[in-house]
Structure formats: structure tokens, C-alpha cells
Amino acid sequence: MTIALRLSDTVSGIAVISDDGDFVCEQTFLPEIDYQLLLRQISSLISGLTANTTTGINAGPPANASPSTALGLCVSDLRYASNGSVTSAVFPFLDDKPLMRDLQAATGLTSAIGNDAQCLGLGARQHDNETLFSLVIDKDLSGAIIMNGKLVKGRNNHAGQITHTPLPFPVPFELDGSVCSCGRTGCLTHFISLPGIEKDYKQLTNTDKSADNIIADATKGDIIADSVIQVLEDRIARALAPVINLLDPDHIIISGQAADKNRLPAILPRKWPGYIVADKPTTEITIITDRHVPCLNGAASLVLQKT
């Protein structure tokens, strides 16, 4: 039995998932925005949710947690530091906190944490024998690698994290020297993200508009908004080209508000031949429009890998 929990700026939720992968129960919640309050909230949610199941598991106070129960946590835009602490662009109060250590102390449960891309890749994989790359495009950009059904973390816990790698094959107007939040220039997240969409639109129109509205206008045929999205799609193709050349994944999963399920699967393969070694790429592309449930499933898979 696994408890899966997701912290997101869109939908946060918790679920009890059986060993067979079935959702025993699930609920959404509004996360606290204070670190200690959040830890207590998570402990309380676990106690309440497990006590109300018919499985006989009673997490109760931390000391009474069942040894067969474990906690997997998915946090949007999560990053890891070498000292075991984390950061999150969505939840800045988590910055520099030893989240996994404190979770285990607060809940009494063996715990594992991952970001949306990592949990999405684990939760949405179709075959355990495939190599998969997952990409999440939202306020930030994150990536992850899944091989043989398991998350590849890497020596520094950053495998697949292409966020702050340079945009491949840049054209002159993209080399404007704009500085990323990390202090470098030319980072992928600077171009492939919701703030990146807004920046491109403002450069064209000198008008501020939310990424939500730009994406909506593009679907309605607005020429300027559509041109911004076309540039984004070309950048996604370029960002994935080195991934294909190096990893050659069987499957690429993309999620996020800017990931159009009707456009990207057709557009990306047409752009890749100019950037990759394979002359006729057969990489499978899947767009996940709602990643909440896959991320919960992935959080459960993440902790099972640890245990």
C-alpha cells in the first residue's frame, strides 16, 4: 500500500494506492504555504485518509504508521541540492529545506520525492522495457528519463533535467543576452515555458498578455499569437533533438499548458530531420493534457523503487 501526494499550483491531491495500482481513495486539498504547517497538514491528511479506508491500514500519528505503508510525493518544479535540500519555483517556502528527511520524521513513513516530469514519466509509461523521456512545460521546464520502468536519477540527481541547458541551434534574435533566473543566458526554460511565451508576445506587440490568453488566441486563429506558438514548437523540437541523438528514446511524453495534443505529435517529427541523426525518426510522442493522476501514480512508483 502506498500513499501518493502531489503538490501543485493547479491541483494538489492525495491518494491511497493499492499494491495492484488501484486507487483506494483520493481527495484534493489546498496546501499550506508555510513549511511547518505543510508538514503537519500532510501528516494529518495521511492519518485521516488511511483511517477512512477499508483496508485496515491506520497511519494515525507518525509512531503508529504501518510499516507496509510508504509515501511518494510529487512537487511541481522541484529541484535538488547536493546537501539533500530542495527548491521549488512554485513553492518557494520549500527552498533550502530537507523535505524528504522532515517528511519521514513528520509521518513516520519511508518517503521519496520527485518533480512533475519524473512522476509523470513513471506514471504514464506504457511498457517497462522502453526508454522514455518526459517533458513538462509550465512556469518552468523540467525533464526526466525512465529506463526499464525505473527513474534514472544520475550521480547528481539531475538526469534528464534540461532546464538550464542552452537552447540548441539558436538563431541571431534568440541571442539577445537576456539573463535567466539562474544567472546564465540562453537557458531552455527562458524560451520554453509560460513566461517565455509571454516574453515573446511582448517583444512582438509591446503588449503584456498572459500565456493562457496567448494560447487561447492562437487556437482561435490570431496570427500573432499563433506565430508565438509556432516559434515555441520549433524550440521544443530543437530542445528534444539532443535528447534523441544522445538517448534515442522509444517514447517522449510532453505535458503542460503549452503542449497542444493536436499539433505537437505532427509538427515535431517534421522538424527533427534538420536537427537529429536519424533520417526518419519513429519516436513515439504522447501529449498528456491532465497529468494529475499520472503524477500520483508516478509518485507511488517512485517510492516503490526506493523500498
Give, region by region, the residue ranges found by the protein language model:
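A charged helix-plus-loop insertion that forms the helical arch/lid used to bind
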Residues: 84-95
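Residue-level detector of high-confidence beta-strand sites
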Residues: 26-28, 89, 122, 154
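Short beta-strand segments
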Residues: 6, 72-76, 114, 133-140, ...
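Glycine-rich phosphate-binding loop of actin/hexokinase-like ATP-binding domains
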Residues: 130-191
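Short, active-site-adjacent cap segments at secondary-structure transitions
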Residues: 77-81, 119-121, 142-143, 152, ...
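Hydrophobic "anchor" residues
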Residues: 22-23, 86, 151-152
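Conserved phosphate-binding catalytic cores of ATP/NTP-utilizing and phosphoryl-transfer enzymes
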Residues: 111-135
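ATP-binding/phosphotransfer module of carbohydrate and carboxylate kinases, centering on a glycine-rich
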Residues: 1-69, 81-83, 101-108, 126-129, ...
